[in-house]
Amino acid sequence: MIMLSFMGFLQSCLLIVNSFAILNERFLNKIGWGVKSDLDMNSFKGKIITLLHSLRFFFRSMFSNI
């Protein structure tokens, strides 16, 4: 029972990260989550933005062959 709830939690986290990863770059720039040269990469926000852009690159490269 505990494993099922933990797996549900992991799946929901993956779905949330995936939903942010498919967002358009213009939308992310409007809300201040675009990649900027003055972004502090050691902050929590900087790490999340880097993760989102890495996921977007990964999913685009993975599905570009289809």
Curated annotation (Swiss-Prot):
Pfam families xrefs: Yos1 (PF08571)
UniProt keyword Cytoplasm, yes or no: no
Transmembrane annotation, as ranges: 7-23
UniProt keyword list: ER-Golgi transport, Membrane, Protein transport, Transmembrane, Transmembrane helix, Transport
A GO biological-process term: endoplasmic reticulum to Golgi vesicle-mediated transport
Domain of life: Eukaryota
Topology in membrane: Single-pass membrane protein
GO CC annotations on file: COPII-coated ER to Golgi transport vesicle; endoplasmic reticulum membrane; Golgi membrane
Subcellular compartments: Membrane
Family per similarity comment: Belongs to the YOS1 family.
Function summary: May be involved in protein transport between endoplasmic reticulum and Golgi apparatus.
Protein's name according to its UniProt entry: Protein transport protein yos1
The species this protein was found in: Dictyostelium discoideum (Social amoeba)
